[in-house]
């Protein structure tokens, strides 16, 4: 038993003496390249156009990058957040629904009874209800990763607009 403990101690001492950490010559390592986490507004716009949406030009106002989309009688916007070098890590679908039917009670009922899309009410001469859906973009997924969130958005946006009393022209 004593021999085994002695042999283990000897092996550990030899291994430690050969370690680059104890000789002062640590091996340099290169950090792995980080993939861009996100999508560009141009590729998201091209993708939505390919799906049949009418996409407006990319705009930047007050530090926010976005474009408008018209589809099925509704106009909504895609906002981009967490952008570095033109690649954005978060996307937000957003729509403003105007009309006297957009009451605080209806917006609160929406938030209570529905998942995924969040909404808020703005009192003004013409009250509005704004609805939003936030999406975190993953590395390497490309625009295809927006397929399910866009399907949820396109399914629930008309429902929200209808519940707020909006009738498409």
Protein language model features and the residues they cover:
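Short, low-complexity, Pro/Ser/Thr/Gly-rich segments in the mature regions of secreted, periplasmic
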Residues: 159-169
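C-terminal segment of classical bacterial N-terminal signal peptides
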Residues: 14-25
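A short, solvent-exposed beta-edge/loop patch
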Residues: 116-161
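Short, internal acidic amphipathic alpha-helical interface segments
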Residues: 35, 89-130
């Amino acid at each position: 038993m004593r021999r085994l403990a002695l042999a283990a101690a000897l092996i550990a001492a030899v291994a430690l003496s050969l370690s680059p950490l104890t000789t002062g010559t640590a091996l340099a390592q290169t950090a792995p390249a980080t993939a861009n986490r996100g999508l560009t507004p141009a590729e998201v716009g091209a993708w939505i156009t390919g799906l049949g949406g009418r996409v407006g030009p990319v705009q930047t106002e007050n530090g926010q990058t976005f474009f408008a989309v018209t589809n099925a009688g509704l106009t909504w916007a895609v906002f981009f957040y967490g952008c570095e070098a033109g690649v954005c890590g978060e996307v937000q679908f957003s729509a403003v629904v105007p009309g006297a039917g957009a009451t605080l009670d209806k917006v609160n009922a929406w938030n209570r009874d529905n998942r995924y899309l969040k909404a808020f009410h703005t009192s003004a001469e013409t009250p509005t209800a704004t609805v939003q859906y936030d999406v975190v973009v993953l590395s390497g997924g490309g625009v295809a990763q927006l397929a399910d969130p866009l399907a949820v958005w396109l399914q629930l946006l008309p429902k929200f607009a209808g519940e707020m009393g909006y009738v498409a022209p």
